[in-house]
Each structure stands twice: as structure tokens, then as C-alpha cells.
Amino acid sequence: MIKRLLSFLDASPVNFLAVKNIADTLLANGFRRVDPSQPLGEVKSGDRFFVTKNDSSVFAFRIGNKPIADAGFHMICAHCDSPTFRIKPNAEMLTEGGIVKLNTEVYGSPIMSTWFDRPLTLAGRVIVRGEDVMQPQTLLLHIKRPLLQISNLAIHFNRQVNDGVALSKQKDVLPLLGQITSQLEAGNLLMNVILEELNSNAAGRELCAKDILDFDLYLADATPACTFGVHNEFISSGRLDDLSMCYAGLEALIASDTTDTTQVLALFDNEETGSQTKQGAGSPFLSFMLKRIALAQSNTEEAYYQAVERAFMISADNAHAWHPNYPEKYDPTNHPMLGGGPVIKFNAAQKYASDAVSAAVFAGLCEKAGVPCQRFVNHSDVAGGSTLGNILASSIPLRGVDMGNAILAMHSCRETGSVADHVFCVKVFTEFYS
């Protein structure tokens, strides 16, 4: 199970590739892809299908034995995006000595210093010319070798570096791409890299620079995910937040059988930037799909509203593990430990969807699955983050709980999680769908 997770993390450096890999797994396990621009058609018990939005979010459904109005739906939500750096248009910046760096902007809230002095690569999607101007072609890009690096300033020029130095997002975190060897490469180095990679994987069509219309490209850690520790009990990887929760939900959905209740896996994009996009949790897209299912079953919108009242949502986004070097940052009585099981998250300011009722439901699921669970509340003097649970609940008023596995160094280029916690999470998710 952990080897599958590590392979998924390595193959999913950005949201677009994560969604492709999830879609491929769904197809391989009997789910069919649905085009949301076409009629949904008849919906029967046991039907398995999924839909994507913007190539960066994916929603999978297994229809229950009972109509959605009668049995509701059980939904696991997570997000496919992670903090990183986006490549700007006109990105190449030629400096002295022919060294080329790339102009970037920050996506989300990364711990920027953790991206320094490590091999990085590029991944994302490239938009190329198609037959219809309204329907350009999308190609995914993942350069599977070290390509870039953000280099620190030597300590001899920055004696205060170990005392904490403010970083400029425009100046300090621009990665080195290469060094031009001829004037012909000037201004074309990035495009040449993109074309070389796309053409090496192309099936028949040879692309040239004029075919490239635009791109959504991001930096990614080039070092593979791994386990570490005396007993290999820890996981070290980028994007544990939140791809580990996405993959746990996927594994649970695949492992489950048809039950009375419809099963939903909703993996959104753009949680790290507020979720207010067509592919984010703030979009009505998921509610549209659920309503279409209800209408296909009963031909009445009333069925959708009944289904919502009978539904339960698990919003799965990683939680903060207790850090042995910084115990003062945590609540004195509610600080989850690595390996202690899934974490229920609470917040008096309603940043999380959990309440006493939904927390009791999730704790009961953990007990049935033979899995320990923990509770997290912020230290009252430390502002915490938020997640997608209540954003989704504001448009679909679902009963639900916010939870996640505990990790260290959230939003670092490489985060630390627990092998045992991933196994626990898949177990309780499978129990939920069952």
C-alpha cells in the first residue's frame, strides 16, 4: 500500500498529473468517464463513473442500491493542489555569463526556504494549437530529471542567514535553468526544453514553437518520495498535503462494493488559494453533478434536497503533527502525534466543518474500522489555517467532519508523514464507504 502511495506521489508533481493518474486508476477499475457537456442519461444501481473539470479536479461516483433521495450519499473530499511556484509568461531572464533564470510567482503559501539548493523540475500542462480555436489541445508535461535549482547566497555574503532572513518572492526564489551556449538559445531555452520533452513523447505530430499557445507550468521537487526512520515508519515527500488524502480516498473507493448509499469522491483544485474557482470547492459544479444524478433517478429536484439532508461528508486535509522541537506552538491537551491515527479538527471560529455530532460519527467509524483517532485544536494564541469543508458546506449544506492525517512541516517542499497513519486512513475511509 505504501509503495503505491509513493509511486503516485512521484508520478503526480502537479494537480494536472494527479488528476490524470487518478482518472487512469478509475478507468482501470471499471469506472467510465462522463462528459459533463452531454446528457447524463440513465443512472442505475452499481453504475460507476467520473468527471473532471479543468484537468485539475475529479469527481467519482458509485451509485447505490437505493435512490439517492432515500439513502443519501457518503462523500470524501480532498484537494489536488499544493503550494509551489508557477512559471510566469515570458519567463526567461538572461543574466551575465549567459546564465538563464526563470521568472516565477508563488502559488499558495510554501515555506520558501525549503525549496533552496535542491534539484527541481518542471511539470504541468501545455496548450497547443488545435483544429478549433475554441478547443485547443492540452498536453501534459513532466520532465523526469533535475532541471532547475534555486541557489542560496553564500553565508560569506549573508552572515545573518542563520538568524532568519526575509525572502523576496520576486528576487530570491528565481530558479536557474541553464547557461546558453550560443546566441540562438537566447530567449528560447525554456521553449526548447518544452518542445524536446513533448516531441519525445509525441505520437506522430512533431510540434514547433508556433504550435505552443500557452502553458500552466510549475516547479516540483525532483527527489523521489521515500520512507525513513529506524523502522521505515515515516514518509518523506512533497505534496503529502493533500495528495496523500486524495490517494487514501481513491484506494477506499476502489476497494469498496456497491452499497445502499451512493459513494462520492470529490477531489478539488485551488484549495491552497481559497477554492473560489470553477474547479474549486467554492464552485457549484459538484452540486450540479449531484443534482443531475438525483434528477436522472427521480425526475424531481426534490430528490436532490432530500439526498443532501441524508448525506455525510468527510473533508480530508492533512493536520499538524506535534513537533518535538516546538512543543510550545501546540494546544496543551490536543496535539496529534505521528502514527496516532486520523485527526478530527475543531475550530471555534468555524474554520472547520466538525461539530460534536459529526465528530462522534467519525470517531465511531474509526472504532468500527479498528483505527485510533485523535483531535486537534489550535493553540489559542496561534492562528491556524482553514480548509475546504465549510467552503463546500456553504453551497451544499452537508453534515460533515474535517479531518486529516498528522504531518510535520506542512507546506514545506518535503513534508513528513506516518506510514501507519496512511494505512489507518484507508481503513476508515473504506469503512465509511461500506
Identify the meaning behind each predicted range.
Residues 1-434:
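N-terminal hydrophobic/helix-forming segments and targeting peptides
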